[in-house]
């Protein structure tokens, strides 16, 4: 959506035709003859979105957003912001969302269990205590994780962590399936957690490893397609320039 319009501005003192260029981006005028506007980059501050900490392009004078759909700038923004939804390119934001979903699903399934497998919170630690989460975010304890209104939605790939209890003592790992502290060799809950990670119940149709494999394959396919398209465009440009 970059538009360039050339109009006649009369003739110079020597009689030569003078052309005035008007260049527009996203419907706004960037250059109009001898005058011009500038663009700026503002940091996005919105903790509720994955764009938090990234930069948006705006008009310097009005601070309104610029969303070019073509050209090098448009391509770079698409590469970064593409969500993969409604035919959009699968950009950085898409893969951040995929990793966030992986982290949340892993944490919830490992902590709470699934239909066929018990979770860490279902097991018992060496003192016979139960209800302890293995994963959390930013190192908070199990109570804080469950009390948070967002619950597991607060977990991202960037902030997933071991819970405070597990970080502060391996004795808090719920290895046993029984509250009986005399069963020192009971590791049934740990074995169930291992089986859970290999099962298809975590994501409903694939295991944790399968999910990552699928995401990596998607990224590889996209990279290969982009490389092929770039080479093809270079060949076309070279052909045009040599005519």
Predicted regions located by residue number:
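Structural signature of extracellular appendage/secretion-system components
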Residues: 1-243
